[in-house]
């Protein structure tokens, strides 16, 4: 029997994030593979055709870990494929590329002034974006870090001090970006039903983060938020419609 070596782990392939197309004819998913040079993973989009029962590869640049279907049954994902766009990405701008399931070259369609870490198509054809927001971006120094809250570090995340996960509603047609909560509220776990967004969040600033986030209901049509469970009042598990 051949021994397992370090390079053996570079051959693993991880399937994730499967979703049906809006017309129900295909399933798109991501396959990620370890990459020694970047000490990370390369991720590409694949399609399973329910009618033909075939699998095809859609992207090959290794930058499609985060993606979403569009209402027109195409695929979009944040990436930066030119030197100028990569430089803007370092400064906190995300660019969305669109590609047809039938193949072809992905084209840059839109951009948002935020670091997007997740995207989902909403029933009203807008998108729910997960954004990594740095409240100290303009004052953060390269030579040292300021720690004024706990926790200030996360496994696989690095320094997290003053950084928050935020939800925003994005209209790609108009470019309008509407945040669900303020910049110091850390959002996590969501569920969508019709025009309602159910999510958990914990508002905190330069203090100790609690372990009991609140549960909120956001109306996608009116932009109104209703508190269902106040923060620190009780411990909750996974919530869903």
Which positions does each model-derived feature cover?
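A generic tandem-repeat structural signature
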Residues: 72-101
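Beta-propeller domains
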Residues: 30-51
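Internal hydrophobic scaffold segments of catalytic domains
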Residues: 98-137, 169
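A short helix->beta-strand "capping" segment at the edge of beta-propeller domains
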Residues: 1-13, 178-179
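Conserved beta-propeller blade repeats
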Residues: 12-27, 61-78, 84, 113-128, ...
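Predominantly five- to eight-bladed beta-propeller fold
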Residues: 43, 85, 90-93, 132-168, ...
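Short loop/turn segments that connect beta-strands within beta-propeller blades
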Residues: 49-53, 100-104, 171-175, 219-223
């Amino acid at each position: 029997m051949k021994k397992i070596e370090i390079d053996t782990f570079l051959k693993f392939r991880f399937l994730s994030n499967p979703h049906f197309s809006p017309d129900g004819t295909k399933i798109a998913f991501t396959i990620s593979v370890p990459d020694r040079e970047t000490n990370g993973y390369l991720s590409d989009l694949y399609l399973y055709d329910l009618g033909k029962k075939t699998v095809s590869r859609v992207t090959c640049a290794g930058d499609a870990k985060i993606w979403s279907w569009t209402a027109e049954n195409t695929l979009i994902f944040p990436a930066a494929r030119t030197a100028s766009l990569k430089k803007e990405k370092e400064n906190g701008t995300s660019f969305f590329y669109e590609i047809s399931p039938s193949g072809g070259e992905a084209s840059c369609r839109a951009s948002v002034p935020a670091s997007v870490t997740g995207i989902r198509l909403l029933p009203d054809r807008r998108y729910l974006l997960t954004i990594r927001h740095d409240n100290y971006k303009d004052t953060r120094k390269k030579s040292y870090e300021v720690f004024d809250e706990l926790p200030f570090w996360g496994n696989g995340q690095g320094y997290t001090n003053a950084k928050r996960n935020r939800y925003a509603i994005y209209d790609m047609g108009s470019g309008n970006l509407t945040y669900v909560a303020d910049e110091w509220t850390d959002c996590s776990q969501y569920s969508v039903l019709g025009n309602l967004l159910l999510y958990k969040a914990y508002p905190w600033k330069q203090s100790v983060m609690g372990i009991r986030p609140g549960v909120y209901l956001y109306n996608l049509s009116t932009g109104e938020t209703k508190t269902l469970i106040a923060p620190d009042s009780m411990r909750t598990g996974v919530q869903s419609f």
